[in-house]
Amino acid sequence: MQWKRKDLLGLYDLSAGEITLILDTAAEFKKVSERRVKKVPALRGMTVVNFFVEPSTRTRVSFELAEQRLSADIVNMQAQASSLLKGETLLDTVKNIEALQVDLVVMRHSATGAQNFIADRLKCGVINAGDGAHEHPTQGLLDLFTIREKKGGFKGLNVSIIGDILHSRVARSNIWGLLKLGANVTVAGPSTLVPREFEEIGVRVCHNLKDAVMDADVVNLLRIQHERQNNGFFPGIGEYASHFGLKAPMMEKMKSDVLIMHPGPINRDVELAGEVADGENSVILEQVTNGLAVRMAVLFLVAGCVKK
């Protein structure tokens, strides 16, 4: 299969074949990262702008390192240092960036759909590094890559996503990707944080941790955002941890080869106990490692269409 998109905006729009192509390409780039010399000339002569209008550490650093390993020229921009603070519109800002003959814009924004809006209006490639509560496609892809690497495939696999599904772009990207590849998906958390409409697309919804994880092959625990407590979505962090935090006694009742995942940053002893995060079933740090290969793959594939 050939990649034909100049943008990566979300997993909702991708076919199973396109997702698999990204994962296969990432597997090749992971081999590059394991060599002594980790750099390849795939994006030499191309310029990538990392435009993060919303704060980020892991995703921004991962993208920047991926770009360096592909030999791209890199420009890092943040909203605080841009003309957005002077009243310039987002579209005018990115139009001016494009006028400098850049090839790719990697963007994170707090507004849902911001990347889709600018991608329709730019000739350069746009990669979504997270938009509002909509999607975080490269996080979804690195989670899929990690699952495939550990489990061999997705058909019939039981994957449970626990936490704040309502506000999570990570959850949405995971759900779309997992369903397209044939996994069975369960989402669980407080009723205020788990929309029932997911049932309409074949996702199992429950509000009990034990029910969600007993038959799971993979458990992906999402960060609880403390700011949601002030909005009345749940009584308190302690109560959330009591009902939905994954602890060692529960692990003993689960499948012995279950994968424990988390997109980070972790709130230890809230979403999961420290001993679970650091335990033998945890692949959390492997997710971080795999994110580099996945982002190299995405940059490489999208850049190939921009060149054309």
Identify the role of each PLM range.
Residues 70, 121-123, 181, 199-201, ...:
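Short, structured coil segments at secondary-structure junctions
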Residues 37-145, 268:
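Phosphate/diphosphate ligand-binding glycine-rich loop within oxidoreductases
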Residues 198-275:
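Rossmann-like adenosine-cofactor binding region
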Residues 1-65:
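Positively charged, low-complexity intrinsically disordered leader regions
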Residues 257-258, 263-308:
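Adenosine-phosphate binding glycine-rich loop
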